[in-house]
């Protein structure tokens, strides 16, 4: 079954007696699949203009008839996991420690200091996600949310040349947005629903996840509000990954903390920003750091199915690759 086949369109609610006007209201809020309806709380659905509690209850009931969303035999869960795919990082050693590459249906986070390859990895994945599956790709499009203005089309062209693909087509398949602030960043993810429901996207990149939040919420007095907003944002990203079977890839910054625990910090005491909220949302967590000379080191710190391990990679004209 293809990814497109696994997404049940929200338009199927019409067969259950829900009128087209109410369906369009859901779409305008970025809710474009039956799974999205089921995973959105009644409270949040009633916040959509024009949807009363009675209407929301009918919509929930109709969605529940189309797709069962309670206890299921584990065999069905196992079957759904067969749809998971991996996108190559460009390095065989890097892919190996990840169990095949960047995984769909979950969030992968990389964090590290300046010039360790976070954005270069994003650019490599933009091309890799479009490659055929036999080349480690996802044969699909990419959504790219840039919070720091570091996206460079010229890098995409260089990486496309490495893989022998048309650079213009590659760029055409990348849906790019520059996030202006944390509110805009949240809205961009919410607006993606209509495009993702088409089933042609394989990867969503946010580079970087915390940059706008750190600017908009700067003092300790605003930390609680920041973490609440971040939690909601990450919940939406998790839902996107699971509902549309795409890989969500986040880059993150680091900060110094000499008293940080080994779980969250690197050997030099630096830890990723975002706290426990981000740590729990990321299924896979990777630390990137500088190695000897031009070498970079990737350490898998947290994964639901792979042990802690590290590898060495380099950044070349064609993106991330193995050392010679």
UniProtKB/Swiss-Prot annotation:
Task: Give the residues the record marks as binding ATP.
Answer: 112-119
Known Gene3D superfamilies for this protein?
5' to 3' exonuclease, C-terminal subdomain, P-loop containing nucleotide triphosphate hydrolases
GO MF annotation list = ATP binding; ATP hydrolysis activity; ATP-dependent DNA damage sensor activity; ATPase inhibitor activity; DNA strand exchange activity; double-stranded DNA binding; single-stranded DNA binding
Where in the cell? Nucleus
- CDD domains in the record, alphabetically? DMC1 (cd19514)
List, alphabetically, the InterPro entries matched. AAA+_ATPase (IPR003593), Dmc1 (IPR011940), DNA_recomb/repair_Rad51_C (IPR013632), DNA_recomb/repair_RecA-like (IPR016467), DNA_repair_Rad51/TF_NusA_a-hlx (IPR010995), P-loop_NTPase (IPR027417), RecA_ATP-bd (IPR020588), RecA_monomer-monomer_interface (IPR020587)
Q: Does the keyword Nucleus apply?
A: yes
Q: Name one GO biological process term.
A: mitotic recombination
The entry's dsDNA-binding residues are: 214, 220, 226
- CC annotations in GO: condensed nuclear chromosome
Residues binding ssDNA are 214, 217, 220, 226, 296
Main localization, broad class: nucleus
Q: What keywords would UniProt list here? A: ATP-binding, Cell cycle, DNA-binding, Meiosis, Nucleotide-binding, Nucleus
PANTHER family found in the cross-reference section: MEIOTIC RECOMBINATION PROTEIN DMC1_LIM15 HOMOLOG, RECA/RAD51/RADA DNA STRAND-PAIRING FAMILY MEMBER
Q: Function, please?
A: Required for meiotic recombination, synaptonemal complex formation and cell cycle progression.
Q: What family is it from?
A: Belongs to the RecA family. DMC1 subfamily.
Q: How does it assemble?
A: Double stacked ring-shaped homooctamer.
The protein's name in its UniProt record: Meiotic recombination protein DLH1
Q: What gene does the UniProt entry assign to this protein?
A: DLH1
